[in-house]
Swiss-Prot record:
Domain of life, source organism: Eukaryota
Family to which this protein belongs: Belongs to the phospholipase A2 family. Group I subfamily.
EC number: 3.1.1.4
Name this polypeptide is given: Phospholipase A2 pkP2
Organism taxonomic ancestry: Eukaryota, Metazoa, Chordata, Craniata, Vertebrata
Catalytic residues as annotated in Swiss-Prot or TrEMBL: H75, D126
Length: 152
């Protein structure tokens, strides 16, 4: 085999090994992102809301900085309720990994009737938040803020 071909093959193998160390996104996070894309076409939810305000992204504390951040606070509270919901007791029913069925048509979201009780609850958490984001302004100055300063 040509040495140049071997180098290319080696580079591909090394890059694939490196990619395997990157953890996949929880499936529900992908569904939630797609719901937001339904209500806000052209948006980039995983980038735009991963580190926004006091509540969008991991954790959350203090007073929301704006309406979009309040959507995240409400969503966080809904997920907290889902974790305590009697129908969501299995570890597979975690709101971060639970898969549910929904439809998106013309910017309108519907949680399907074939969801179990836990899936329906989590679907409605995500649906409500996606609709909330669609009605709230996105303020770039609230992205990647100093939470120690602004989230008291």
């Amino acid at each position: 085999m040509n040495p140049a071909h071997l180098l290319v093959l080696l580079a591909v193998c090394v890059s694939l090994l490196g990619a395997s160390a990157i953890p996949p996104l929880p499936l529900n996070l992908v569904q939630f992102s797609n719901m937001i894309k339904c209500t806000i076409p052209g948006s980039r939810p995983l980038l735009d809301y991963a580190d926004y305000g006091c509540y969008c992204g991991a954790g959350g504390s203090g007073t929301p900085v704006d309406e979009s951040d309040r959507c995240c606070q409400t969503h966080d509270n809904c997920y907290s309720q889902a974790k305590k919901h009697p129908a969501c007791k299995s570890p597979l029913d975690s709101p971060y990994i639970k898969i549910y069925s929904y439809t998106c048509s013309g910017g309108s979201l519907t949680c399907r009737d074939d969801n179990d009780e836990c899936g329906a609850f989590i679907c409605n958490c995500d649906r409500t938040a996606a609709i909330c984001f669609a009605g709230a302004p996105y303020n770039k100055e609230n992205y990647n803020i100093d939470t120690k300063k602004h989230c008291k």
